[in-house]
């Protein structure tokens, strides 16, 4: 029955598969794959005979797509008559499908031999298609679409420029120490800045320099190294981007080294030779600096690039191949690309370490030392090195001596402290009451602005955001376990206001510049007072005002002394319960957390002038503060440090980040030296 059963035209006795390629006796032509049929038709139109049937023709020749014989027509890599670009279909044929040969255009993919670092290239390239030609910088034409993307429209809430208290910055004390410190500038003018940069600054609607910019611009333009401490949100990014971009516009690109022996001199160069390198600790921060660099390099020959871990390395490599003059990177991914031979540091003129204390605290010192001292980067005397951060404790300053030469130390305002634009409130809340108090605060303040909530653990971030969603508050979360795509999407929804509540771990605490954050809530207080400074600095930026609320209980008594000092410095109200807990004697001196350095003294003074001094007493030994607190300087006097009990990663030398010293995974990794 099955032998005779037919359904429509389908028979159970007949195979529904295509017949196998026939032999010569069958008289049928060999099977030709679909992607080769058009090529065969083109060959027949040129008068070429089809491949003869039989076993020898079972596999038609592939044009450059196999390890076998090359096609019979000329122009291949063996006899190298010419090098035609790939066909329009993206296949491996070096001849267009219309059968007509196309002459090789050396400018088709950029300037051969100069694709990596932009040297000597006269072709339009860069974030705004500007050019460097005949020793002159020729800006590209305006692009309204790109301008809207980079600078936004007037009164665009996603593009923050200056706030209502910005003029008060003129009253902030500034301390600059070093030999022959240049005079500050009071406006964006030429000199010292390039005219094209000034036009981009005007597009960004920046009217006057911030205090850190007033000093950093002439210091860097005069070729000096710089260590700058400025309160968070005070324009540190512009403080280093403005002078290095201005110098680039005036001086042009550096020549790219000649290809090594055996390398071909045509096509796109695979290794990039940037002239400026900016290192920062987190993916979010390097992305933010890259966006600012694109903004101020608009219509110029300078091409900014960004590389960081957790993202597709292939797309980052393609971006680098298109040209890389200013590179923004995290230390780990940069080391990876150097090992792959895709980036050379031989042309570096400017090395910038942003959030330098965070990078060293997070255990990036081995990678930074390898990048600066172990690769082909020019010697400290042959480059300019700039360090920017909100805090610079003494032991970090001592380490910085290895990277800087004859530097100017710049301290703006109460740095290592907090901005007076931030109203700080400390509430006594037990752990089991935190959710209900948080709901009360959110109901009181509403969602008119952006609210950033900091927690200590990844699990708490997910749990709290789910709780807020169930309470009909639009919330999202970012932490280290989320993919880069998820983190970028969450930040974009938060920035745009579609999701005005963001729950974050410390991954978002350092350096992020998110406009219009009106309220920062420390749901879990950190064990390090510097982390608290970085967290609340996400609001009150660029002269705007903000509110910072901290949930405090006796579990946080390790930071009570530093918290009281911080509130007093910023002229904030000190709750009575903080003073009573401090008097109980359990919170004197140090910062625990990652080994504890102690705040002993002002963490923003120039070590060359004020010497070492002792650290704090440390916090409870179980949290790594231990005995001694800060190292207090090697030869400048002051107490040394044992670093704290090793039960929480204090170990030896607590002033170097405790358990995370030398550990690339940062403070959340295991407490070991590797």
Swiss-Prot record:
Catalytic class of the enzyme: hydrolase
Subcellular locations according to the entry: Cytoplasm
GO BP field: cytoplasmic translational initiation; negative regulation of cytoplasmic translational initiation in response to stress; positive regulation of formation of translation preinitiation complex; regulatory ncRNA-mediated gene silencing; spliceosomal complex disassembly
EC number(s) from the headed UniProt entry: 3.6.4.13
Gene Ontology molecular function: any one: RNA strand annealing activity
Motif (Q motif): 186-214
Family matches, as InterPro entries: DEAD/DEAH_box_helicase_dom, Ded1/Dbp1_DEADc, Helicase_ATP-bd, Helicase_C-like, P-loop_NTPase, RNA-helicase_DEAD-box_CS, RNA_helicase_DEAD_Q_motif
Feature: compositional bias, Gly residues: 586-601
Gene3D superfamilies hit by this protein: P-loop containing nucleotide triphosphate hydrolases
Region annotated Disordered, chain positions: 1-151, 583-615
Disulfide bonds: none
Helicase ATP-binding domain ranges (all copies): 217-410
Listed Polar residues bias regions: 10-26
Protein function: ATP-binding RNA helicase involved in translation initiation. Remodels RNA in response to ADP and ATP concentrations by facilitating disruption, but also formation of RNA duplexes.
The record's note on its domains: The Q motif is unique to and characteristic of the DEAD box family of RNA helicases and controls ATP binding and hydrolysis.
Family assignment from sequence similarity: Belongs to the DEAD box helicase family. DDX3/DED1 subfamily.
Record PANTHER family: ATP-DEPENDENT RNA HELICASE DBP3
Annotated protein name in UniProt: ATP-dependent RNA helicase ded1
Species, as recorded: Aspergillus terreus (strain NIH 2624 / FGSC A1156)
Gene that this polypeptide is encoded by: ded1
């Amino acid at each position: 029955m099955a032998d005779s059963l037919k359904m429509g035209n389908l028979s159970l006795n007949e195979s529904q598969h295509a017949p196998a390629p026939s032999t010569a006796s069958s008289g049928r032509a060999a099977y030709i794959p679909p992607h080769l049929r058009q090529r065969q038709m083109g060959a027949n139109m040129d008068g070429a005979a089809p491949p003869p049937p039989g076993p020898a023709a079972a596999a038609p020749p592939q044009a450059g797509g196999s390890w076998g014989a090359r096609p019979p027509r000329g122009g291949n890599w063996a006899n190298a008559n010419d090098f035609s670009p790939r066909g329009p279909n993206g296949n491996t044929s070096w001849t267009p499908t219309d059968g007509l040969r196309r002459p090789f255009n050396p400018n088709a993919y950029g300037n051969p031999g100069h694709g990596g670092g932009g040297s000597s290239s006269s072709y339009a390239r860069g974030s705004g298609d500007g050019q460097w030609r005949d020793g002159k910088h020729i800006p590209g034409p305006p692009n309204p679409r790109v301008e809207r993307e980079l600078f936004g429209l007037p009164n665009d809430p996603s593009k923050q420029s200056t706030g209502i208290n910005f003029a008060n910055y003129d009253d902030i004390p500034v301390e600059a120490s070093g030999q022959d410190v240049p005079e500050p500038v009071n406006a964006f003018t030429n000199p010292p800045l390039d005219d094209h940069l000034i036009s981009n600054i005007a597009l960004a609607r920046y009217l006057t320099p911030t205090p850190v910019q007033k000093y950093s611009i002439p210091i860097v333009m005069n070729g000096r190294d710089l260590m700058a401490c400025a309160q968070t949100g005070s324009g540190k990014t512009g403080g280093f981007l403005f002078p290095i971009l201005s110098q680039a516009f005036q001086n042009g690109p550096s020549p790219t080294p000649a290809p090594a022996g055996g390398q071909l001199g045509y096509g796109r160069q695979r290794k990039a030779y940037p002239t400026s390198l900016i290192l920062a600790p987190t993916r979010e921060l390097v992305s933010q600096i890259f966006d600012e660099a694109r903004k101020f390099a608009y219509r110029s020959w300078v091409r900014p690039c960004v590389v960081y871990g957790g993202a597709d390395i292939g797309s980052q490599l393609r971006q680098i191949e298109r040209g890389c003059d200013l590179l923004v990177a995290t230390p780990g991914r940069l080391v990876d690309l150097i090992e792959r031979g895709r980036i050379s540091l031989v042309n570096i003129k400017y090395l910038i370490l942003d959030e330098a204390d965070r990078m060293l605290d997070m255990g990036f010192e081995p990678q930074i030392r390898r990048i600066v001292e172990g690769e082909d980067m020019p010697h400290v005397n042959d480059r300019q090195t700039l360090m920017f951060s909100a805090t610079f404790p003494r032991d970090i300053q001592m380490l910085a001596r290895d990277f800087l030469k004859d530097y100017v130390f710049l301290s703006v305002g109460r740095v290592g402290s907090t901005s007076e634009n931030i109203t700080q409130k400390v509430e006594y809340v037990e752990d089991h009451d935190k959710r209900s108090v948080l709901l009360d605060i959110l109901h009181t303040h509403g969602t008119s602005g952006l609210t950033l909530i900091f927690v200590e653990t990844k699990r708490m971030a997910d749990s709290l955001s789910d709780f807020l969603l169930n309470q009909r508050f639009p919330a999202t979360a970012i932490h280290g376990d989320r993919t880069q795509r998820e983190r970028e999407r969450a930040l974009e929804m938060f920035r745009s206001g579609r999701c005005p509540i963001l729950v974050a771990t410390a991954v978002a605490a350092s350096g992020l510049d998110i406009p219009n954050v009106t309220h920062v809530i420390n749901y879990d207080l950190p064990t390090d007072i510097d982390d608290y400074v970085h967290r609340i600095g996400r609001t009150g930026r660029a002269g705007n005002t903000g509110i910072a609320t901290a949930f405090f209980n006796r579990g946080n008594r390790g930071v009570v002394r530093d918290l009281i000092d911080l509130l007093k410095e910023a002229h904030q109200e000190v709750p009575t319960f903080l003073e009573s807990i401090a008097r109980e004697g359990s919170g004197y001196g140090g910062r625990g957390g990652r080994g504890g350095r102690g705040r002993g003294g002002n963490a923003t003074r120039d070590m060359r002038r004020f010497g070492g001094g002792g650290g704090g007493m440390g916090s409870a030994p179980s949290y790594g503060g231990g005995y001694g607190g800060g190292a207090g300087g090697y030869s400048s006097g002051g107490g040394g440090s044992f670093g704290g009990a090793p039960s929480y990663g204090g170990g030896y030398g607590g002033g170097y980040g405790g358990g995370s010293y030398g550990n690339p995974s940062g403070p959340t990794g295991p407490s070991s030296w590797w």
